[in-house]
Amino acid sequence: MSEPLVLETSRLRLVPIATADAEEWWGTIWSDLDVARYLPPQGILPVEAVRERIRIAMEHWATHGFGIWMLRETRSGSLVGHCGLLANESSDPELVYALCRQVWGRGLATEAAAAVLAYAFDTHNLAQVSAYVFPRNTASSRVLRKLDFHAEGQVRRFQAHLDHFVLRHE
């Protein structure tokens, strides 16, 4: 596989996940219950678990040619979240994202996801992408609808009922 690609938008630089991101990613996303409650396993993770997620994510990049990008604000360089695609053995690749509370409501999730989806559809010729959202996470559902995802009902994953959304590439 080729080296992971850096993507850029008007306000973000999307950099493939790396081992050096562990503490900063933990501090930005995984140590904040208001953010982590919407991510499996629905709670704060210890930094060691975040390091393991990074190891798995880097293997995913090597295997599939896509994965998780760290989201850095272009102006400040600050890490504000992550966004990416994960291969799913039982269905379509899955769009995943999370942003720190300090940037909620600014459209950055939509901006990052649009860049990831454009890359995925253009480079990997995917037919469709899925996303799964906890029903109480209405902000995330709005992001997906802005990106033209369509609700497909609910599924049971991660010991919870999640709303399932699909975006078909045309």
Model-found features: residue ranges?
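A short helix-loop-beta-strand connector motif used in the catalytic cores of GNAT acetyltransferases and
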Residues: 57-70
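Short amphipathic alpha-helix in the helical subdomain of ABC transporter nucleotide-binding domains
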Residues: 46-50
